[in-house]
Amino acid sequence: MKTIVKLDLDKKPWEQDGQIHNRWHPDLPMIAMVKPGDEFRVECMDWTGGQIGNNDSANDVRDVDLTQVHYLSGPIGVEGAEPGDLMVVDILDVGTFDDSQWGFNGLFAKENGGGFLTDHFPEASKTIWDFHGVYTTSRHVPKVRYAGIMHPGLIGCLPSKELLDTWNKREGDLIATDPDRVPPLACPPTSQSAVMGRLSGDAAKKAAAEGARTVPPRDHGGNCDIKNLTKGSRVYFPVYVKDGGLSMGDLHFSQGDGEITFCGAIEMAGYLDIKVGLIKDGVKKYGIKNPVFQPSPITPTYRDYMIFEGISVDEAGKQHYLDVHIAYRQACLNAIEYLKKFGYSGEQAVSILGTAPVEGHISGIVDIPNACATLWIPTEIFEFDIRPNADGPKIMVPPGVDVSFTS
């Protein structure tokens, strides 16, 4: 397997021979060219570029510079790719580095990123997870062990200038409705901390000022955080520029549906083994607007779940109309309160929901006024039985063990 992106984790992202970028822009030069049918390896930094350490303090999570993220490897060109084609990407393997057998999960401070449950957990915290082959455990969250579903949280092709302008316009219009909101409604372009691959000089400055942040998923894929995009899966990406420009990063060892902690998976450095192909004029042939994918046949299978429901009624008891966001939040909060009965802190429970292979489902979307969302927690990940019984829950978490907080 040929490695076409080779990184040095002891160096900063901007010291990697132009192989890293953290903005989306059509003018980014291809760092390598491959042919349809080629198989190759791409090494990736963790999404923060090494800002988070394997330690017992959350100060680095509190102070993380979010103008830097995400650091992506690429873009990689595919010979013959043209706008309107579909780029076929087979994820052959996802792996860890031998000298980096750990990852991290964090709750961001409300003033610096926040997250899905930031009003309930506004302070920064962190958990470290150690890798044992396909399994992971944490010194900060005892009594759980689960098989990872390693995947890229972020992968996609470069946008065209027209698509980039569309993104910036629609997200700018949204920000304008509440420009002082904390956390913000969206992340507008900023040249601060921009790393523009192999662009240089005035061209790099111009692209940095208008390049799209990598934070959200968009029409091209991007930061979708889909845990099922693991080895054995296939993705069909719309192509918007000549050669396609495939970039990837934000690798996860394991993640729950929704990535509710925002820094919401077990984040890691590692590698992707990729095979690429093309379907000429595939966007028109299949009417594809956003990427579509086929899941892997080899993901871990759990047989028994505790499933928590949530409806469109918020924490204050106010009724909302078919609001899936509120319903999923309520399902998560219900699960957190349940796990606390076994001795987990709220932060430990949130970390479990963000890192374990939990399933999130929209179970009902038509029965007015309530949507119903469900959160499925596999019971087999725990070293004890979490199912209800007549004796009631018992405290199973050793005293004094918790997530890392700030000092």
Swiss-Prot record:
Could you say which EC number(s) this protein's record lists?
Answer: 3.5.1.49
Its keywords, alphabetically, are:
Hydrolase
Q: What class of enzyme is it?
A: hydrolase
Q: Does the keyword Lyase apply?
A: no
Protein origin, superkingdom: Bacteria
The family classification in the record reads: Belongs to the acetamidase/formamidase family.
Q: What is this protein called?
A: Formamidase
Gene of origin? Answer: fmdA
